[in-house]
Amino acid sequence: MAQFYYKRNVNAPYRDRIPLRIVRAESELSPSEKAYLNAVEKGDYASVKKSLEEAEIYFKININCIDPLGRTALLIAIENENLELIELLLSFNVYVGDALLHAIRKEVVGAVELLLNHKKPSGEKQVPPILLDKQFSEFTPDITPIILAAHTNNYEIIKLLVQKGVSVPRPHEVRCNCVECVSSSDVDSLRHSRSRLNIYKALASPSLIALSSEDPFLTAFQLSWELQELSKVENEFKSEYEELSRQCKQFAKDLLDQTRSSRELEIILNYRDDNSLLEEQSGNDLARLKLAIKYRQKEFVAQPNCQQLLASRWYDEFPGWRRRHWAVKMVTCFIVGLLFPVFSVCYLIAPKSPLGLFIRKPFIKFICHTASYLTFLFLLLLASQHIDRSDLNRQGPPPTIVEWMILPWVLGFIWGEIKQMWDGGLQDYIHDWWNLMDFVMNSLYLATISLKIVAFVKYSALNPRESWDMWHPTLVAEALFAIANIFSSLRLISLFTANSHLGPLQISLGRMLLDILKFLFIYCLVLLAFANGLNQLYFYYEETKGLSCKGIRCEKQNNAFSTLFETLQSLFWSIFGLINLYVTNVKAQHEFTEFVGATMFGTYNVISLVVLLNMLIAMMNNSYQLIADHADIEWKFARTKLWMSYFEEGGTLPTPFNVIPSPKSLWYLIKWIWTHLCKKKMRRKPESFGTIGRRAADNLRRHHQYQEVMRNLVKRYVAAMIRDAKTEEGLTEENFKELKQDISSFRFEVLGLLRGSKLSTVQSAQGTKESSNSADSDEKSDNEGSSKDKKKNFSLFDLTTLIHPRSAAIAAERHTISNGSALVVQEPPREKQRKVNFVTDIRHFGLFHRRSKQHAAAEQNANQIFSVSEGVARQQAEGPLERSIQLESRTLASRGDLNIPGLSEQCILVDHRERNTDSLGVQVSKRVCSFKSEKVVVEDTVPIIPKEKKHAKEEDSSADYDANLTDTITHEDYVTTRL
């Protein structure tokens, strides 16, 4: 940095200057190249084409040159979305490079299509790489067109690329140890991780999934789950993977939003993709919904259409349940709950009876199971009151009547958990926290029953309870039974999920438990650290003599830090303020030890109370807020899991009736034993081809129905996505840039048309001049002096005012009546027509300058009127007719100049005068000429010039007005100027 500082001298300014220069200078563009790129930027098609054509001949410019921003002409045209220039540049084989990627990023569909259809030059037409300017690439090598298009989520571009047969590389697992992954990670680990992330971004594109996947729902489910697992492994890109996972979940939900009928919804939710065509499938088991719950697709499950279908199945027997009064609902549930033993017995005896089928309904099954569990809790309450207990000092007491009644419920719970684990698998069983709680509760009840049996068999004497051993089986059984009662009561919280008010609260409580576990990990570390230090300090001061009570639970607390276990207890209870400060004192006069111990104890309280406890409160508040923000989705997902557990075929009977073997269960058991254990195994009867064919046809029909529904859903989703994108886009800066580019291109197109029109007009005038010299020689000789005084400056509008007939086909058949007499104008011979060149400009018809204030009245008639306008001549089709009109007008003008009678019968001048006091007046005159059956109205706008300024105006004549082509003829009060 020393080079930035200079020694200040006497003549130096107040503040020194640091010289600046471009250290990474690039090659300068030539003026021709700058003009070429500027023309591309402005959209000047003609100039760009001219530059490209000159470059092919003279090689003056490099058509692949780049501007200071590193853009070629093709990239500039792509940014401006000028498809005409893009097509022009590609026709001249400019260097393409990353143009396709730029077009995809800008989402210019037309440019992408042009680039995809463009064939690269080969052989001599191909530009050598050494002649190309090195363009800095904005894209990494792993970014392919399909990956970039998927990142932009542009459906049209993705469709164009997929039609070309592109492919996406399959990403490897994070822990993949193949040679490719290991070598790529060793060479550049960052690029390896970024490449995987870019691939997953492309695969998670909703448009790509909708376009290329046969089963978009399954693809979205699996991809979101995989991305969620990746976020746990690659913590560096955790937020990106979680966002992609949410994107896939939202896509599945939005796609399900497009369903319009219950039939479509049932086809989607009942579709099973893991069975072959020859296997028997159940068409009403909500297989796709179960898969969504397995992959934790909360948005999909909580979608209103899905919830409506589930609710209709849940309240199958009560269609108007939600509209009933709350009192009616409570009475109905109470009656069904009281009758659950009757329904259970009916199902055991006759499963197909009306009452047996009634209990199989999901809602009735839920009420019966809830009533059974409430009965179990009532029995636990009776057992805790010891109503039938007579002798409390018996070491091995026999079971009471209430305990005998509790035993069937405990056995029923255990049997239900075994069946659930058998049907769903161990992995699915342990993923549910309520199942873990049930496992702990059932284990405690089994341990209690076992210890009571041991105590009943081993101990039968009557001894005072104070004399029993600490680890007596009866005492341990009572402790375990008390803990099991707590778990049993808390298990009732799981039923709150069915209620819309208590459900979100129960979910928030479950989320807070996770925060408490995280907090306990840090707290236990702090607790163990301070407990070790305090125990090391006070270990030597333990008091044992003369104490009837030892520990912190005594009336006078002592030996709080004598052992490690006692120290842990003391520090834990100090959080609640139950430990006194004097426990840090010692009998010896060791004040330093007391000071250090009190300081350590105070520091622990500050850390645990002020820091950790407030941190726990903040974490729990954050968890509750997360649930509150998505309370509806979280609650509906939890309720759906509860409902689905009752939609299953098994587990119909509530506890304890599920322990009783039903006739159906006995028949299944005997059949299984006969099939698997008997020596003579029954050979399976082969199925007929007709049965297999019908099954395959049914499965194929379901598959075709599903694909048809998916096709309709994808079409609706794409249409809605494009519509929403247009709605949300609004007016942005890009729109103004596009509008500016369109205006600039239109400006250059108009200028090109005007140049071509002016050139053709001049050439036509020069050709007409030679043919009209003989007819106009008399007019020029008689009025040579007056024509010099009447020269004016005409604008481009005045010189390009054209006459267009509105009906040329009818003009030849009609006659025009003027001044009360009809005059038929005959067409000139065809030989003369071929020699005469039709003039499209008004200069060949004459400009009239008013001399007097007299007004001439023009008679109105119903014949057709010609219109005067500015533009490109349309008279090529009506050429012969207009040539005749031109020749007749010249003849009539000559007759008027020579005072030939009848001129007034041919032309009527209608004058309109408009004056302005602040500026020069403008005189508008109309000449109405009668030719055949057409009326021609010519409007001339001529500035009125005073006589004293005529000579000055003669010197300032415009360059656009050619004096050699004009002459003036004076007739009565008017001056006719001939061009």
Curated annotation (Swiss-Prot):
Residues 777-788 have a biased composition (Basic and acidic residues). Zn(2+) binds at residues 172, 176, 178, 181. This is Short transient receptor potential channel 4. The chain crosses the membrane at residues 363-383, 404-418, 433-453, 476-498, 512-534, 600-620. It is a multi-pass membrane protein. SUPFAM superfamilies: Ankyrin repeat. The gene is TRPC4. Belongs to the transient receptor (TC 1.A.4) family. STrpC subfamily. TRPC4 sub-subfamily. One of its GO terms (cellular component) is cation channel complex.
